[in-house]
């Protein structure tokens, strides 16, 4: 697929989001924030608000990242292009589950997911400074029951550490998944259907 000529900025450090944008031929430049890990980003407060629904939470973070990216362009006098922001969050019985803070936390999260169905929500937002739009993908993922050894060995690979829910569907954790309903790319971290809708609404040809 020939890359589109217009560029965007991707306000994310995620290698999976970069891979998915390349998959559909989008030209982009990275626009990194300070910090970069959940809870450590000086530009984006990722603390859930009291009583905030998970759908609103994930949308708020994606919008905030895109809008913060536009401000960063102004501060740094960078060429003006639209900024794409995204956030992925898991929900299990009303509990928001983000990235693990350490190996013990990763193991605890995987024990929670074992043998159960959870939701994966990925919101994507696009902003050019004067207009901002967003879309959200919601999928369901069911894990088979996992034993302690499986969880310990998986955590030891290091794969869970930079991922919401402590697993990557495109990696070794694919062996844990009995069923998915929804968007595979949304579960990876960037729903391509919704992303294409946003790009086209801003006049980016695909």
Curated annotation (Swiss-Prot):
Cofactor section: a divalent metal cation
Record-given protein name: dTTP/UTP pyrophosphatase
GO cellular component: cytoplasm
Organism: Aromatoleum aromaticum (strain DSM 19018 / LMG 30748 / EbN1) (Azoarcus sp. (strain EbN1))
Chain positions of site Important for substrate specificity: 16, 88, 170
Keyword tags: Cytoplasm, Hydrolase, Nucleotide metabolism
Record's subcellular location: Cytoplasm
A single MF term (Gene Ontology): UTP diphosphatase activity
BP GO terms, sorted: nucleotide metabolic process
Catalytic activity: dTTP + H2O = dTMP + diphosphate + H(+); UTP + H2O = UMP + diphosphate + H(+)
Family annotation (HAMAP family): Maf
Catalytic residue positions: 87 (proton acceptor)
Similarity remark: Belongs to the Maf family. YhdE subfamily.
Function of the molecule: Nucleoside triphosphate pyrophosphatase that hydrolyzes dTTP and UTP. May have a dual role in cell division arrest and in preventing the incorporation of modified nucleotides into cellular nucleic acids.
Principal location: cytoplasm
